[in-house]
Amino acid sequence: MLGKHTKLFFGVSLVALIVSVILAAWGFPKIVSKQIQKNIQIDNSSVMFEKWRKIPMPLTFNVYVFNVTNVEDVNNGAKPRLQQIGPYAYKEYRERTVLGYGDNDTVSYTLKKTFIFDQEASGLLSEDDEVTVIHFSYMAAILTVNDMMPSITGVVNGALEQFFTNLTDPFLRVKVKDLFFDGVYVNCAGNHSALGLVCGKLKADAPQTMRPAGDGNGFYFSMFSHMNRTESGPYEMIRGRENIKELGHIISYKGKSFMKNWGNDMYCGQLNGSDASIFPPIDENNVPEKLYTFEPEVCRSLYASLVGKSSIFNMSAYYYEISSDALASKSANPGNKCYCKKNWSANHDGCLIMGILNLMPCQDAPAIASLPHFYLASEELLEYFDGGISPDKEKHNTYIYLEPVTGVVLKGLRRLQFNIELRNIPMVPQLAKVPTGLFPLLWIEEGAELPDSIIQELRQSHTLLGYVEAVRWALLAIAIVATAISAIAVARSGLIPVWPRNANSVSFILSPHPNSDVNKVH
C-alpha cells in the first residue's frame, strides 16, 4: 500500500515539476506580458488610453531669451554680448482628439497644446518684461531675398522699412508676451512699390510664425502662437494591439508617410519613432541603442542614444540622451548628408557645421536649430560672442528616463534653440557694419515628470509584479522539492533500480520484497 502511494506521489510531483517549469519559463511571462499589453495599448478599454488622450498633468514649457546688451557696439562691428533671461515658465496642457481607427492597428488623431503663464515658477519675471533680441522675422526676410535675388536686396529692404516699424537696426525691442504669443504687428498698408510683393508673398504662403491681423492690413509675428490652442496633425500612430513592440510608432503626419522636405532620401525622409509621449516596453534582452521621436517642428526624426540603466524615483529606468552624432556634420556622420539642402542658399551647399540643423526646408525660413548655448556644436560658433554663451551638459542637453516594463516616460526634457544668421550686407544700411555670425534668439525647455499619484501607481504595479515573480519561482521550487522527496522515497522503497555497493556485481531490485534473491555475475 505504501509503495502504491509513493509511486502516486512521485508521479504527481513529476507532473507538477513539468508544469511548473513550463509556467516559469513561458506561462507566467506570457500572462504578464499580455496583461501589460492590455493595459498600455491605445484602446478605449485600456488603463493608458485616457492618460494618453488627455495628459493628466501639465508639462513644463520654459523659455530663455538672449537679451543683447551692447546693441550699438554690434551695429558698429563688435562681437555681441548676450544676457540670458529666464525661465519664463508656462504650463503646457495636451489633449488629443481621436479621428478614427485604421484596419492596420492604427489610430488617427490631432494634438492640441494650451500654454498658460506660470507666475510662481517664473519668479520675478513677467510677460511684460522688455528685451532686446535679434530681429528674427526681419533677418529671415532679408536673408531669403539676399540668397535668392541679391540684386534686389536694397529695394526690398526699403519695403521692409515700412513693413517693420522703427527698423533702425537688426534688433527688436519687444515685450516678452508679444515675442512669444501675442505677436508683433507688421504693416502692409505702406506705399513702397515692393511692399505689395512682400505682403502678397505672405498672404499666399505665410510661415507659421506669421498670422494675419484682424484689420486685413498686416500680420502678427510671434514664435509660439501657432502652437497655442490650435490642433496639429493629423497624426497616424500604431496602437500596439497586434504588436506591442510597435506601440506609439508614427506612420504618417498630415497624410504623409514620407517627409519630402529633404528630397527623396529614405533615411532623412522616413518617419521614425513616436511623438515622445508613449513608447513600447523595453525587451531587457534586446535594449534599443537609439530611441527615436518624430519632431514636426523640424520635419524629421531625431534620436537619443542609450547611456545605460539608471534609477529614478526608486525605480529602474533606461537613460537616453542626445549625442553628438544626432546633429553631426556630414564629415563626422555621413548619414546626415541628406539633410544638406543646396538650393536654399547661394553661400554654401546647405551642409552646416557640427551641431546645428538647417530648418529652411521645413519652415520656409532661414532659421537654424541647435541645442541651447550651442552645446555639442562646433566651437567656432562660440568665438563670435563676447560673453553670454556657455554650453553645459547638465543645463542644455536633451534626455529621457524610460521605465522598461511599461515604456512610460518617468522624466524627460527636450531642449531646442532657435538661431538665425546676422549677416553683413553692405547695401543694407541696417547691416552695413554688423559682424557676420550665427545669432541665437531664444531656447525652449519642454519637460515632463510624473506626479506622485502616477508614480505610486507604477510602484504598486511593480510590487504586484514582484509578487507574481515570487509565486512563479516559489511554485517551481516547491515542485522541485516535492519531486526530489518523492524520488528519494521511491528509491528507498525499492521501486526503481539502484547500483549495488559491490563494485564487482550489478543488481537490479525488481520488487520491494526484502528476501529477493540477488543474481551475481562472476
From Swiss-Prot:
Residues 29-469 are extracellular. The keyword Glycoprotein applies. InterPro entries: CD36_fam. The keyword Lipid biosynthesis does not apply. Disulfide bonds join 268-338, 299-362, 340-351. One of its GO terms (molecular function) is scavenger receptor activity. Glycans are attached at residues 44, 67, 104, 166, 191, 228, 272, 314, 343. The chain crosses the membrane at residues 8-28, 470-490. It is a multi-pass membrane protein. One of its GO terms (biological process) is sensory perception of smell. Keywords: Cell membrane, Disulfide bond, Glycoprotein, Membrane, Olfaction, Receptor, Sensory transduction, Transmembrane, Transmembrane helix. One of its GO terms (cellular component) is cytoplasm. Pfam families: CD36. Belongs to the CD36 family. This is Sensory neuron membrane protein 2. The lineage of its organism: Eukaryota, Metazoa, Ecdysozoa, Arthropoda, Hexapoda.
